[in-house]
Regions:
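ER/Golgi luminal nucleotide-sugar-dependent glycosyltransferases, focusing on the catalytic module
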Residues: 1-209
């Protein structure tokens, strides 16, 4: 579990005595993405075949932001059956990323203000700058499939200070980069229902829509 200092103390008190809970204290910077990358780069996730990435961000700027978060969690791990259904895909060694198919976004409008930054980051991991990502940034992932992201070695200072940004930040770009990294590592992305998901082939320049 990653959390800012004030919340980390409370979480340690709640989880005291549970050896299965590890609290990683991180500043409130880079939203859920920067702490997740820290956990990845630190090696804390290496011992797992699959990791569930969820967060408590409510996206108050979206009319249905909290509802979306609840729907995503329910689909990924809202019941033992849902969890088993998602995890079953990791029995296939080719699968690296699993999430809710209806929230896998490939339409050009979802580039928003992040395209140039995604293109630059994709070039750094030698991946094509295509568009296809799980909106809401909640999914199951095989840590080994994120090896290209570890090579970015992004310091905390590379992430913008928290100012309620709605788009155009490093963490927004990385949200869109994750499936590209999975593909670059040689793995597939699947919807929970089994459909193979691929990023849209878009030109590297020109109109956004």
């Amino acid at each position: 579990v990653t959390a800012p200092p004030a919340q980390a103390a409370r979480l340690r008190a709640i989880s005291a005595g549970d050896a299965g809970v590890e609290i990683l204290e991180r500043p409130n910077r880079g939203r859920d993405i920067a702490p997740f990358l820290h956990a990845l780069q630190s090696g804390a996730l290496d011992r797992f075949d699959a990791v569930l990435k969820v967060h408590t961000k409510k996206s108050p700027h979206l009319l249905q932001g909290d509802l979306r978060r609840r729907v995503l969690f329910a689909a990924l791990a809202g019941s033992p059956a849902a969890t088993a259904r998602a995890l079953a895909w990791f029995g296939d060694p080719k699968v690296g990323l699993v999430g809710p198919g209806p929230y896998f976004r490939t339409a050009p409008v979802y580039w928003m203000d992040d395209r140039a930054r995604v293109e630059a980051l994709a070039a750094r991991i030698d991946a094509p700058a295509r568009l296809g990502f799980f909106e809401g940034s909640m999914f199951w992932v095989r840590p080994a499939a994120l090896a290209p992201l570890r090579g970015l070695d992004l310091p905390l200072e590379a992430f913008e200070a928290e100012a309620g940004q709605l788009d155009g930040t490093l963490h927004h770009a990385l949200e869109r980069l994750i499936p590209l990294a999975v593909t670059r590592a040689g793995y597939e992305t699947r919807a929970i229902g089994g459909r193979r998901l691929t990023a849209a082939r878009l030109a590297s320049a020109g109109p956004m829509a």
